[in-house]
Amino acid sequence: MEFFSNIGKIQYQGPKSTDPLSFKYYNPEEVINGKTMREHLKFALSWWHTMGGDGTDMFGCGTTDKTWGQSDPAARAKAKVDAAFEIMDKLSIDYYCFHDRDLSPEYGSLKATNDQLDIVTDYIKEKQGDKFKCLWGTAKCFDHPRFMHGAGTSPSADVFAFSAAQIKKALESTVKLGGNGYVFWGGREGYETLLNTNMGLELDNMARLMKMAVEYGRSIGFKGDFYIEPKPKEPTKHQYDFDTATVLGFLRKYGLDKDFKMNIEANHATLAQHTFQHELRVARDNGVFGSIDANQGDVLLGWDTDQFPTNIYDTTMCMYEVIKAGGFTNGGLNFDAKARRGSFTPEDIFYSYIAGMDAFALGFRAALKLIEDGRIDKFVADRYASWNTGIGADIIAGKADFASLEKYALEKGEVTASLSSGRQEMLESIVNNVLFSL
């Protein structure tokens, strides 16, 4: 059965095309620096938003039909698979990401739920063949009432045990589907008030859960990356995985820093009052850059809007960081994004993905041009040149101490003249110059 019979394979037509069902900047098979664009960008479909998100929000019911022609949950789960792979094929998307309950809902017991999940993952494995791949999987340990106080950080040991069992199965499903990543996102791992919270115990327990996951994952042959996806709030008032720097502190405290990388989401950076590039830079500088949830938020709003990314400045600086990090290895660009509630037709799925894919393709082209242009890199290198010789080199080499630095400062006198302009406006103009000359 074809779900989108009125939509053909989306073709690259170039920037002058006015056909909304065409790529203007994403040319999947174009070879750049020895790799095709699809290999550089590694786009992924998000199973939750794309296959299940029907536009329901806190103020109204769904506006789009995501039943895929099936009323029975088991039949619907398989129909989702067929529809997802049709979307991916028509958009030249090679990867998908999932929560366990996106693939198959809960049934009467954990065993029944696991049995039904096995049926669906068997079907996915059969249908994906060598054409489609799992970028990463995760467990949906946040929506059911049992997780109202958290999963790994729950005050109930029974809930912790249930969470571990669910994660165990999600890891098995990820391995079965050939996934190269497994994500922890702590939607309920945090608190509403410290009046009823044992923060130390909760963080200790979260670390215990993650250590168990790493040990079990490796024992069943998972060779990919474990990720944590930082987010400061929503649905919890204060989440423990607030931002990349906070997560790094957590990982280092519990000896998990060699086991985990970051899955950075643009909208989560906005909620933490950081730029997207800031979060990527912190991850890159600390050797924990892994994967990206590609979306954008609204800076005028205080919640996770999960819009499809269309801001070219953001995608350019994102891809600048990705390229500087050496590109993706096991990670990729997962569109953790949903069409707006008022964009409710089947065609809107394709319009949305085309917008996001073109935005990142253009950002990738611009980032490459920025690096090849070299003016920004040269400016930064020149700005810090004093650290290459003389007293700067001595400090870096560990040859200086307070006594020698005091002696140097006394002999040198006032040092204000050693400073140069930061030239922020000039550098921003260079970015514009590169962007609008593509």
From Swiss-Prot:
Compartments reported by the entry: Cytoplasm
A single MF term (Gene Ontology): magnesium ion binding
EC top class named in words: isomerase
Catalytic activity: alpha-D-xylose = alpha-D-xylulofuranose
Cofactor: how and how many bound: Binds 2 magnesium ions per subunit.
Residues reported to bind Mg(2+) 1: E229, E265, D293, D336
Binding, Mg(2+) 2: E265, H268, D304, D306
Enzyme Commission code: 5.3.1.5
Biological process annotations from GO: D-xylose metabolic process
Record's GO cellular component terms: cytoplasm
Superkingdom per UniProt: Bacteria
Transmembrane segments: none
Cofactor(s) the protein requires to work: Mg(2+)
Location of the active site: H99, D102
Keywords assigned: Carbohydrate metabolism, Cytoplasm, Isomerase, Magnesium, Metal-binding, Xylose metabolism
Entries under HAMAP family matching the protein: Xylose_isom_A
Description of how the protein assembles with itself and partners: Homotetramer.
Similarity comment text for this entry: Belongs to the xylose isomerase family.
Name of this chain's protein: Xylose isomerase
Annotated gene: xylA
